[in-house]
């Protein structure tokens, strides 16, 4: 029997890097994740360089930077055809590879190297349009939707809550908890463990859709937070109040709600979704204990990106600020694989590092296309170039463990934060630090030298160049 370790990738969607109890969050309750993190190695400086679902997942699945995946913004319906993927390489190495939950690739049933996928991508507008072929319609191609209709009737649909997939509105789940997609992911994972081929190691990706909206946790979890005095969002001296006043009444805007009670509801609903997911991860871990395989199983937990959650008058992701780009990341398992348990590392980690880390743990070769570095060793990354195309908010940033420089490509606006002294980005100290800003700006110019958008002439940053969401080379992979 193959003695290599089993590998589980636990993936949250839109979970902030600070939203773990073990990380010192004042409000959110994550007992099962805390237990796993406490028995592992936790990375305090883990980031998503292109912080929305599609580009972030492209990086995680391939180990490539956003420049090399070609995904520099959010764009559905673009084919995924990468020669080397995490699941594909583990499959070639002799692992049985199973995904349960969110993939967010195109076409929907692109297994991306997995032997099997039990799919639930959440609510995706692009796959519910009248022109969508029936086999690509989410209500047919998505396993959770298909299962829910079998259980509750053909009219059953998670959108019956009336909540949008990018809304800050909160409402309890309207069906029994066992029908919630978060429960479904855990249940399907438990069933996989029951029926797996025990003669070979497995790679299981348990990919939860929450705490990405809709914020529809079962009532029990909402009750944990709804009457609590929750910490308020962070505000800064640079916040865009004009933009906030313009957009604030749109329930799916990039801005946070204006009513303080709505902000508290938003945060309560978000934390409830996290705790609900945490408890279902507990269900999954209990199955590992029952199967007596915890002593040869490695668990890596991560999110694709974060959530602003009202900080700096903002909501959602695709922003260059800590709430949006910083993600939780830890590796839990036997010390013979991961090193000393209980360690907290400050290496500058990014989603591209997940693939080489898991391949090394499996004893599999790491393809030359991989840009990331295995987290099993010190990460020698002095800075990170991040970006996201989003209309007038299209931006780039240079991030170090100490500070951050931000440039908005359509307006030329610049921000600089000293993260060592101001981790919540409350003061823009651009004018006070001209030499350091010039150093970081030079790094950004260098990172953008060969970009098709023409963001730089090699000497300065050029404002107003047309941004794209998908670089041209992606179309010919």
Language-model features: where?
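Residues forming the ATP-binding cleft of Hanks-type serine/threonine protein kinase domains
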Residues: 420
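Formylglycine-dependent sulfatase
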Residues: 1-408, 414, 423-442, 469-477
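A contiguous, mid-protein "functional segment" used to position or interact
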Residues: 433-458
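Extracellular C-type lectin-like domains
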Residues: 417
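Short, charged, surface-exposed hinge/linker loops at domain edges
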Residues: 453-472
